[in-house]
Amino acid sequence: MFCVQCEQTIRTPAGNGCSYAQGMCGKTAETSDLQDLLIAALQGLSAWAVKAREYGIINHDVDSFAPRAFFSTLTNVNFDSPRIVGYAREAIALREALKAQCLAVDANARVDNPMADLQLVSDDLGELQRQAAEFTPNKDKAAIGENILGLRLLCLYGLKGAAAYMEHAHVLGQYDNDIYAQYHKIMAWLGTWPADMNALLECSMEIGQMNFKVMSILDAGETSKYGHPTPTQVNVKATAGKCILISGHDLKDLYNLLEQTEGTGVNVYTHGEMLPAHGYPELRKFKHLVGNYGSGWQNQQVEFARFPGPIVMTSNCIIDPTVGAYDDRIWTRSIVGWPGVRHLDGEDFSAVIAQAQQMAGFPYSEIPHLITVGFGRQTLLGAADTLIDLVSREKLRHIFLLGGCDGARGERHYFTDFATSVPDDCLILTLACGKYRFNKLEFGDIEGLPRLVDAGQCNDAYSAIILAVTLAEKLGCGVNDLPLSLVLSWFEQKAIVILLTLLSLGVKNIVTGPTAPGFLTPDLLAVLNEKFGLRSITTVEEDMKQLLSA
């Protein structure tokens, strides 16, 4: 086992990465190794997808499957080894079908890629795990060095984050052939184990630029189906009655659940990155979408154990449900998996609803505590002139984009301290689950404009980028000249690709934490600092002083 893709990876003087019987996320060595095997199979599939496009062959089954299966290897998504192997077998079957299509056009069609003809050696998981050793990401570290390995992983993990967003967009009916062609090209190239530093750096920026397009179509999918988010108050306390909790990012699953629970007497609560759903008109119209439950994903083993109803996980993040003994009432959807947990293959939630009706639910309603969400792209753009007016009248000094992933590391309290230290004449724009560090606190307003503005899920960084570009255009300056600072927390691969997106767009002087990614060497961090001004957090006082004086 070798996995260094998330923020909580093991770090020792000898090197970084989880390489024992189990990773810090709870992933076993078996599952981790089989995920490496799956990635190799997907690289072979992409190699043939690239070749097929040369013949004008576009296989939509391949295009929809490849990013979805890659998403299953993202942190805290799928811990179920047999399902990972199932994805690998499906990848190989799709590859062979695509290969046959190519050979039907050109009998001499071939692909020069080491993954292009990969076959699984056995049905036995142990044998497959031994085969997977051939594809361990750091297998040639001694030959290529830590810097090349780090850049490879930056590209691989960044592309994995983009694949997750591609799947979210695809679920909502969004497809862009140019994006899929670019995805396959990059995925196939990474399967050749590239070792050119400049080419890898260029690839990382290409991934960032591609992901900006992905976030654009995801935004289009969400807003076309569910309307543009508008500021909405959400209760974060319990309401009496039977209940279901839904977590993850998939708004379509939430919509289907709301439709199927309507009139059943079962209330629905959002958790984690589902919180922004309350801002969408077509979702909040359901009166039994009563509120948001819990805090950051890392607290779920305590909070889920206390929730008196079933739980549905639609995407990341799931962690071991046996610890809180709620594994008999947690359900997984789509690419999510945990051994022994019931999985919903389709969009029928009747079994979940039946379980909710058999459980006690919340016995009484707590005193409401309301927070505000729903500052989506359209709302943010509508406030652009107000922001400029406040800046011109010196009522608004600075905007801090304070967002990203949450996690268990104690140093993450930095983000709470930073938020509460932001001066009263400054505004906090937040997104993603890192907001749970401070989103239930009171921040007041500046002439009626809330000082805490929740822009949505992690992918809604797109809205923040569009706002920044709009402000820069209206002020006749560059984005880096705005009174705007980005202080980002990271945990997994979606955050990595958001960072690559920002860097590829030329955004500079981003501050990240709580630690640097374990796969980035001191040399690589120095390069990113020199090129983009990217740096790690220090202390709240020092960072605040520096950012306000920039």
From Swiss-Prot:
EC number of this enzyme: 1.7.99.1
CDD domains in the cross-refs: HCP (cd01914)
Enzyme kind, highest EC tier: oxidoreductase
One Gene Ontology molecular-function label: hydroxylamine reductase activity
Catalysed conversion reaction: A + NH4(+) + H2O = hydroxylamine + AH2 + H(+)
Tagged with keyword Oxidoreductase: yes
Annotated positions binding [2Fe-2S] cluster: C3, C6, C18, C25
SUPFAM superfamilies: Prismane protein-like (SSF56821)
Ranges annotated as spanning the membrane: none
Sections of the chain in a coiled coil: none
Compartments where found: Cytoplasm
UniProt keyword annotations, A-Z: 2Fe-2S, Cytoplasm, Iron, Iron-sulfur, Metal-binding, Oxidoreductase
Residue positions binding hybrid [4Fe-2O-2S] cluster: H249, E273, C317, C405, C433, C458, E492, K494
Pfam family, one: Prismane
GO biological process, one term: response to hydrogen peroxide
Chain positions found as Cysteine persulfide: C405
The UniProt record lists the keyword 4Fe-4S: no
Cofactor needs: [2Fe-2S] cluster; hybrid [4Fe-2O-2S] cluster
Highest taxon of source: Bacteria
Cofactor note: Binds 1 [2Fe-2S] cluster. Binds 1 hybrid [4Fe-2O-2S] cluster.
One Gene Ontology cellular component annotation held by this UniProt entry: cytoplasm
Function: Catalyzes the reduction of hydroxylamine to form NH(3) and H(2)O.
Family the entry assigns: Belongs to the HCP family.
Protein name in UniProt: Hydroxylamine reductase
Biological source species: Escherichia coli O7:K1 (strain IAI39 / ExPEC)
Gene from which this protein is expressed: hcp
